[in-house]
């Protein structure tokens, strides 16, 4: 993360861009909460370094602090959109699709569609934060480069163990991306879950290195119990809710009552779904919201005679774009705890980002998704 920030530059706007690129990249692969917690201390150190400068106006430092904190929160949420493992709603979508239609969404299939959306939202949110929401008078901040170098020096050279974990991480990502068009030729039954398990277990087998040679494992059970297993329980609960909705007939009953939507065009229905999920997740868990809505949207697609992907993907993406309130997402709560932001700041800046994300998701899902995933949005093949 620090390397990415140092490479992008010391201009105030570039520092914020560096934080957003680093945060979003990390969020593609690890929990957005962990990413925000990791990036926050670095951001606070940069803001404090700027406040110590005699040339820095107090108001300018406050503006920079707010913008940097929001950039961390926004990019942590946006980065998760890019990959299937980036955020729990994406996994719930894949799981429910497998449960209801026995259709697999591979890592690569989601990545091809999710990454461009993530990049587009990062660019737009950076321009919005640095040129519209906040206006910086102080353009240069060379001391920021010094602080970043200090943080890098504290870390020291990359260790053997870090190299091992990085290698496993790269191999995992490459295996996920190449599975559908390369690895399945040699191992037809290989799927993304097996790849994840193999690479995860390998960390328990590979050993660390010290002056006396190899001794401990890279990971042990004490490390494993500290992992956020609650997310997996929530994920399992979401699939159980989906099955309950289907088997009880509740999903079909709700879908039947949505027949009034039949008179509207698909793009209007999409806009309603995206906006509803977007603002609903401001006050509720995005995982719970998606687990509740996706089993309803599947039969609703049959009633409306549209492809279920179009409604389900739209809802899934919009669940990751709640930028207004501290309770909306864990990254929002993390940066709010830094005391650089007020709720009014988050609402003022976040509401326009919500609206921007609604428009971007609407355009991408309606026009691009059917092309990338090769389906007819006005035809339901699962009837």
Language-model segments: which ranges?
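Hydrophobic transmembrane alpha-helices of multi-pass small-molecule transporters
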Residues: 99-102, 109-256, 274, 352-358, ...
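In a subset of proteins, long, contiguous C-terminal domains/tails are tracked
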Residues: 295-304, 312, 316-383
């Amino acid at each position: 993360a620090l390397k990415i920030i140092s490479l992008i530059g010391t201009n105030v706007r570039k520092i914020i861009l560096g934080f957003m690129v680093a945060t979003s990249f990390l969020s593609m692969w690890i929990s957005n909460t962990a990413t925000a917690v990791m990036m926050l201390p670095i951001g606070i150190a940069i803001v404090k370094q700027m406040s110590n400068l005699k040339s820095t106006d107090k108001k300018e430092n406050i503006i920079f602090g707010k913008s940097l904190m929001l950039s961390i929160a926004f990019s942590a949420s946006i980065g998760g959109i890019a990959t299937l493992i980036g955020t729990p709603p994406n996994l719930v979508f894949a799981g429910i699709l497998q449960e209801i239609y026995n259709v697999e969404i591979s890592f690569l299939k989601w990545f091809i569609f999710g990454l461009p959306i993530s990049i587009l939202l990062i660019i737009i949110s950076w321009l919005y934060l640095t040129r519209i929401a906040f206006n910086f008078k102080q353009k240069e901040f060379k001391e920021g480069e010094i602080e970043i170098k200090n943080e890098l020096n504290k870390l020291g050279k990359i260790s053997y163990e870090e190299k091992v974990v990085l290698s496993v991480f790269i191999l995992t990502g490459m295996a996920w991306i190449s599975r559908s068009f390369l690895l399945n030729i040699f191992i037809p039954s290989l799927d993304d879950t097996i790849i994840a398990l193999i690479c995860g277990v390998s960390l328990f087998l590979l050993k660390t290195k010290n002056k006396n040679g190899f001794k401990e494992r890279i990971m042990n059970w004490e490390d494993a119990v500290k992992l956020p297993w609650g997310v997996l329980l929530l994920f399992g609960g979401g699939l159980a809710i989906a099955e309950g909705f289907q088997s009880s007939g509740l999903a079909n009953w709700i879908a039947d009552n949505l027949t009034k939507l039949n008179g509207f065009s698909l793009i209007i229905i999409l806009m309603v779904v995206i906006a509803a999920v977007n603002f609903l997740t401001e006050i509720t868990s995005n995982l719970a919201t998606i687990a509740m809505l996706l089993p309803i949207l599947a039969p609703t697609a049959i009633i409306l005679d549209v492809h279920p992907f179009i409604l389900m993907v739209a809802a899934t993406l919009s669940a990751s774009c709640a930028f207004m309130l501290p309770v909306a997402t864990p990254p929002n709560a993390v940066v709010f705890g830094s005391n650089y932001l007020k709720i009014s700041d988050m609402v003022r800046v976040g509401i326009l980002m919500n609206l921007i994300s609604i428009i971007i998701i609407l355009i991408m899902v309606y026009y691009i998704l059917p092309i990338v995933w090769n389906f007819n949005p006005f035809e339901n093949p699962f009837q």
